[in-house]
Amino acid sequence: MPRSVNHVASKARRKKILKLTRGYFGARKNVWTVAKNTWEKGLTYAFRDRRNKKRNFRALWIQRINAAARLEGMSYSKLMGGLHKAGIEINRKVLADLAVNHPEAFKAVVAKAKVA
């Protein structure tokens, strides 16, 4: 009895991956094994960088807060310590947004931290 293979499903699976790799350079877009490896590696990078994105944004917020705090004559660590003592629970994302888009509100927050 001859071997039975489901060629339709195999071709559909390969076609699906090759469709996902459109726009890649060279053999990465049309050679099955190269395209599959590239696509899998891309998923690995995506998984890793979804986690790294959170670290990068936190670092960016801290840099922005530090720069704005130093314009007000305070370091980042003194500002955060003062906010903690004053009982002001405001996260770094919002603080960075205040520093960039609403400097007057940020100055008011810094003033409260200085008093504490």
From Swiss-Prot:
Q: Which CDD domains match?
A: Ribosomal_L20
* GO biological process terms, semicolon-separated: ribosomal large subunit assembly; translation
Q: List the disulfide bonds.
A: none
What Pfam families does the entry give? Ribosomal_L20
Q: Which UniProt keywords apply?
A: Ribonucleoprotein, Ribosomal protein, RNA-binding, rRNA-binding
- List the GO molecular function terms: rRNA binding; structural constituent of ribosome
Instruction: List cellular component terms (GO).
Output: ribonucleoprotein complex; ribosome
Q: Which SUPFAM superfamilies match?
A: Ribosomal protein L20
Show the HAMAP family listed in the entry: Ribosomal_bL20
Family of this protein? Belongs to the bacterial ribosomal protein bL20 family.
Q: What does this protein do?
A: Binds directly to 23S ribosomal RNA and is necessary for the in vitro assembly process of the 50S ribosomal subunit. It is not involved in the protein synthesizing functions of that subunit.
Name of the protein: Large ribosomal subunit protein bL20
Its organism's taxonomic lineage begins at: Bacteria, Pseudomonadati, Bacteroidota, Bacteroidia, Bacteroidales
